[in-house]
Amino acid sequence: MSAEANKALVRRWFAELDKRNLAIINELIPEDYLDHNPPLPDLPPGREGVRESSVRLLAAFPDAVHIINDQMAEGDKVMTRLTTRATFLGPIFGFPPSGKTVEVSGIAVHRVVEGQLVEHWAHLDMVGFMEQITPSVVPDESP
């Protein structure tokens, strides 16, 4: 596939997730998918890990949307700089939902082989994300 076709495939992946079309996982993610930075702990490997993380993340952030800010491709790799925006409506990482809108920026790199996303690296602003989902604590300043 060409670099442009690979970029289109990654855009389709995010667009289908935004539509809550989890059937896309069977189409675009092979059983032996390799995620170098899984989004959640204790996930099974491969396609099943992608499915489980998608279900868990959508339970916490059911209206999540991915905004593609920039995209580059070379060879079989596609780099996507994106922003994910969602409302925190379900528990995650042990934190109760706040109902607040959260936003996290990051970079995802996918390796594309024969029309499938076979490998993934991600670097997200997890500090900013955690600051948005953790309850605010105001320190007691009394003497």
PLM regions with names:
Residues 1-143:
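C-terminal and inter-domain tail/linker signature
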